[in-house]
Amino acid sequence: MQLGMIGLGRMGANIVRRLAKGGHDCVVYDHDPDAVKAMAGEDRTTGVASLRELSQRLSAPRVVWVMVPAGNITTAVIEELANTLEAGDIVIDGGNTYYRDDLRHEKHVVQEGNSPTRLCTSGGVWGRERGYCLMIGGDGDAFARAEPIFATVAPGVAAAPRTPGRDGEVAPSEQGYLHCGPCGSGHFVKMVHNGIEYGMMASLAEGLNILRNADVGTRVQHGDAETAPLPNPECYQYDFDIPEVAEVWRRGSVIGSWLLDLTAIALRESPDLAEFSGRVSDSGEGRWTAIAAIDEGVPAPVLTTALQSRFASRDLDDFANKALSAMRKQFGGHAEKPAN
């Protein structure tokens, strides 16, 4: 098939390379001319200088994949595409767009007669080799037309053992892509995926931190009125090799996972993770997942606590902590203990 790709960052460029390797022809555009120039020399890839030229180079009915940062940039690109594409063309939004924005974008595309297909990907910088997990929402006919593209980009059935009981024809989900439903559904599923990711990351990080501090009993304890003493220091005399623990967990343990694999790589490269400040960002999906849980009235304490922990990592709780110290001083005359 022929595809237009808008956005040649790490994800967009590697998706193009995976598609080209699978026999698809790609017309590519990026706001950075150097990025287009770098890609244009690669196999089955043609670079263009504008969205209008991209539209002209593609044969109707067109398939255009938008892979730019979510938010205002995606909105601007989709609005411009609505003026350059034709009835029956397919627009794939592959970024981490808020599913509610999908519903808003749909109006722009539908008004021009195009088929809005919202796609979300998981795979990051490893996707070129591993393939990308694709959660797709939108018109069913548009999905069917673009399915050869999805099948090429996805990891394939060999990426994981088949679930017991699935012995018949291989389903798209087993290949790593799924039509989740109407417009917005794909990004909704990816939103929850990322919320789960926050929780999994937080639990793994907290567990490793408990292991790292299991030698607290060997440290000099200074008892005072402001510090609860460690009652049983003899129980905390362990100096664990954290990279080795992560390595053994990778083999046969219940928590073995790709996330643990990546953590083991990071710990091998830097056992103390000294180059990281511990200031953890969030890209929005965790917040949106928490909002959805509130709107639905369903409990999600693990996911929301993981999100709040990211906020705390940026010292956004600094004033709250000062307020706590101030209250303790006011009601009990408790002085703050200096940091070690």
Where in the sequence are the language-model features?
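Short glycine-/small-residue-rich Rossmann-like dinucleotide-binding loops
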Residues: 67-70, 96, 121, 154
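NAD(P)+-binding Rossmann beta1-loop-alpha1 motif at the extreme N-terminus of oxidoreductases
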Residues: 1-63, 84, 88, 125-129, ...
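Rossmann-fold NAD(P)-binding glycine/threonine-rich loop
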Residues: 87-90, 94-143
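General beta-strand structural signal in soluble alpha/beta enzymes
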Residues: 47-49, 93, 111, 115-119, ...
